[in-house]
Amino acid sequence: AGGHTIQDDEPKYGLCVTGFVNPASMWKNIGAETGDVLILTKPLGTGILSTAVKGEMASEEETAYAASVMATLNRYARDKVVDLQVHACTDVTGFGLAGHALEMAKGSGKTLCISLGSLPIMKGALDSASMGFIPAGAYRNREFAGGECEFSWKNHSGESSENFWLEKTRCEAVENETGRSETIINEAELAAREDIVFDPQTSGGLL
């Protein structure tokens, strides 16, 4: 269940979908447990790319790619994990990854650790963010959630008063287990990735 909060000058139309669900089969945005792995099913950046499109600064390829991602149903991701034990799930939409992850963390009484370097990001979104194509909703999301997110250069020690911990490097434990090489990210890209964390998503994925 969900909805949209819209504040702009463009006309919109709305739809309503109703149905039935078995309460025992519902996934809620609370209930995350210590040791759970976070899976993000779609790349981030729709709000930033949409802003770039309105500014006529996005390429045809970037525009088509963003549209294809938004048109992809979450049903396919759901079907891949429906037989697994999912403790918590949320969509990533208007409040951005930060807002929805924070809601999950608070509701579960846990701290979520997310590596900025590991986040999937749409083609062109980093460049568009670096050029300043940040939607107004991203600033509101940062104002709402930014004070409860902690950005750190170091790996999370497991002890934090924050609900949401964002690392500026990949999680060391993940690197050691998978054998993947370290990703080096410069300051400009880090700033753009921080903006994308707060970017409001249209037809975003699941977390």
Task: Mark where each language-model region is.
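Helix-biased detector of long, well-ordered alpha-helical tracts
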Residues: A1-L207
